[in-house]
Amino acid sequence: MKFVATLIACGLSGLALAAPTATVNSLGKRAADDAAFGYASLNGGTTGGAGGTTTTVSSYAAFTAAVSSDAKKVVYVSGPIKQSAKQVKVGSNTSIIGKDSTAVLEGFGLLVKEKSNVIIRNLGVKKVLAENGDAIGIQYSNNVWVDHVDVSSDRDHDKDYYDGLIDVTHAADYVTISNSYIHDHWKASLVGHSDNNGDEDKGHLRVTYANNYWSNINSRAPSLRFGTGHIYNSYFENVSDGINTRDGAQVLVESNQFVGSSKALYSTDDGYAVERDNDFGGAKNTALQGTLTTVPYSYSLLGSSKVKSAVVGVAGQTLKF
């Protein structure tokens, strides 16, 4: 059975329609023309560097220089770049796109701070030490689309050896994380960094997680404080502690499948959730009942029984440019 939800909030019009999941055969054709969806499609939309200059880089120095300004630009990454360094700061109006699956940043991550209109697609980021920050950090920023990325570390070290894979903090807003492979990590993705930051975060931190493959994760898949989350069409494999809603967060969880999880959907510190058509694989939903039943954009649901076949092998760096 195919589940389809079309949810339009009152007072909003002209929202771009998008199909979050592409078939394998259509990925290459659609890669260059795909548009941001979910929360990143709101607030004027997220177009990155469309219409700006185009550059291809293959070294750390060239990459750092290419992404820094706020001018419209598309930066293609060709091949791997390895450097043990602090996060590279990304300017507004930027698209960072890996040309293929070899475009991997190792040892350093990306920081989108006090910026807007940023797209990160088809890029790998791995093994960023905690002292160097998150693999992808989004702070004080709005309209960011992270799509078809492969982010990971390992679990051979203790939980504090690496920091987060994709963290959205300090009142960041209108963010979508989609079609991504998030794996082999202790604490994967955090929305809202502190129980004491409610004054700044409340009314912000609107994040969509769609069509993602989470694998071999200990916790934070994701963990949300204060904000609003929509998590759908995702496959969770060997994720011990999955979706954690806390500190008043409201989360809508739909059409997901969990295999090998201890806690699929749960609440600490009074977080809330509404769940529909999820296969928790024997784990339980212990979150407090929430009120988030609709979101202000259109989307399509796969149905929990179809998520694995649609997401595994498609999520991650599967595009070519």
From Swiss-Prot:
Its cofactor is Ca(2+). Residues 1-18 form the signal peptide. It comes from the Eukaryota. Binds 1 Ca(2+) ion per subunit. The active site is at R220. Its EC number is 4.2.2.2. It is found in: Secreted. Ca(2+) binds at D134, D163, D167. Keywords: Calcium, Carbohydrate metabolism, Cell wall biogenesis/degradation, Glycoprotein, Lyase, Metal-binding, Polysaccharide degradation, Secreted, Signal. GO terms for molecular function: fibrinogen binding; metal ion binding; pectate lyase activity. Its main location: secreted. One of its GO terms (cellular component) is extracellular region. GO terms for biological process: cell wall organization; pectin catabolic process. It catalyses: Eliminative cleavage of (1->4)-alpha-D-galacturonan to give oligosaccharides with 4-deoxy-alpha-D-galact-4-enuronosyl groups at their non-reducing ends. Pectinolytic enzyme consist of four classes of enzymes: pectin lyase, polygalacturonase, pectin methylesterase and rhamnogalacturonase. Among pectinolytic enzymes, pectin lyase is the most important in depolymerization of pectin, since it cleaves internal glycosidic bonds of highly methylated pectins. Favors pectate, the anion, over pectin, the methyl ester. This is Probable pectate lyase A.
